[in-house]
UniProtKB/Swiss-Prot annotation:
PROSITE patterns: PROKAR_LIPOPROTEIN
Residues bearing a lipid moiety (S-diacylglycerol cysteine): C23
Descriptive protein name: Uncharacterized lipoprotein SE_0142
Subcellular location: Cell membrane
Species of origin: Staphylococcus epidermidis (strain ATCC 12228 / FDA PCI 1200)
Predominant location: membrane
Keyword Iron recorded: no
Topological category with respect to the lipid bilayer: Lipid-anchor
Amino acid sequence: MKHSSKIIVFVSFLILTIFIGGCGFINKEDSKETEIKQNFNKMLNVYPTKNLEDFYDKEGYRDEEFDKDDKGTWIIRSEMTKQPKGKIMISRGMVLYINRNTRTTKGYFLISEITEDKNGFAHNKDKKYPVVMKHNKIIPTKPIPDDKLKKEIENFKFFVQYGNFKNLKDYKDGEISYNPNVPSYSAKYQLSNNDYNVKQLRKRYDIPTKKAPKLLLKGDGDLKGASVGRKDLEFTFVENKEENIFFTDSINFKPTERDES
């Protein structure tokens, strides 16, 4: 009888230990998700910045690579990529280099066609259209005979100008990844079509699917680091071998290149 009681006590203790350990693991995961959200909030607070010239006065995270007199350059990029079934993958987007030293901005509109050869190797065919920004307006620096393309470039809006993450804290059940050796971290969430940012993307782009996207937040650097470094966003609507639809956005604060100073 005593032997049976000992077994029951031992089994009960083992179950309790596993339960407590499991709760500890869950709490640890929740804590890491909260930490990642807090870190992303530092960058996502710039969404929306309707006037891109406001970046001239925004300070980002400065590491040892910055010269003391360098105010830094913001690099912003937004791009929509679509590959309908049976067709090639085409990306359309824009990159701007916002120089805080000279308070000037230049960049390019990019159309990229990605094909795959019979051996499975990908090949890119890129076409760039140089632009500058003045008074928050995008201006092509070379003649563009295609009026439709010219208007697309001139009317282009970056995601940072209309995106909003004030409800980030409400995103639940994220897939969390953290590698302290790099260090790098990410969080992935399944969104609904009622999400504000999803509605904004559908309003601005022809997205040929009713599927709601997954949002992937990616960052590099110490989670406890201050201010904004590099962060990437990806809204994936469809992803498989035959069809792909995704939108990417990134904000990066870097030392200014010498020829840009």
